[in-house]
Amino acid sequence: VLRQLSAIFDTRKLGYTSSLVAMEIEPDKLEHVAHQINKHPGVSHNYEREHEFNLWFTLAVPPGSDLEKELEKFSKLDGIKKTRMLPTLQLFKIGVKLDMVDDKKHEVKPSEEKKKVTDVKFVPTEEDKEFIRELQKDMEIVDRPFQKAAENLGMTEDQIFEKLHHYEEIGVMRRYAAILRHREAGFTANGMIVWKVPKERITEVGNKLGAFPQVSHCYERPVYPDWPYNVFSMIHCKSFDEAGQMTKDIQKQIAVNDYKILFSSREFKKTRVEYFVEHEFEIEKTITA
């Protein structure tokens, strides 16, 4: 059930550029395209979803790299009909908290306060990069799990905790947490609810959505002629009926009538981007006979 236990860093604070990407892929080519895209070290999440745009993934590139040029590398793959870049325009919430105890279910209402983070410009030094490389590793379950990192970095364990606390205060580290495999933990209905929100209401609706404990992620993203939905929210439920009811409960409270739920039908990749680590990347254009 446990996927990883490590520091979770903020992509943008580290100078990385990232975007959600939606693709329409010919169904018989979908698996091949997904597996080729998975080879890119900047791809952390990659899902098949039940929609005309049937492949959704996140792509992050390090400082100095061009995200659009990096995305262009995938265009040589056979079977891609459309590609839509959907970068974050406003972030309202990020951070999955799965309720593992049924009898402690939260009422579906906007009851959470937004976490306040000091907005400090952060330019990572080589020392910072070395620290991040070490602390993004999956933690070993031992008596003193930070001892090895401290030795590798020439620090004490207390100094590690102080630096992590500082990173959290300035928003460089979002949290130090365990990441669960949603499906194995019983959360089989993972829905991306996309909302068509009037422009003047985007911030209000986004903040309200972010206050629902059931919503793990919430963003404003750009629209296209064939994609009118500008606010994205994620929910994680144990059944499709529960997800449908939860969506209706949320919808009544935010008063947005035009929306869709896109469920993930297949997970092709879910991992953490390894920051400040060099990787080679090559793709095979077509399916080999």
Model-derived features with residue positions:
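A compositional/biophysical signature of low hydrophobicity enriched in polar/charged and small residues
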Residues: 1-289
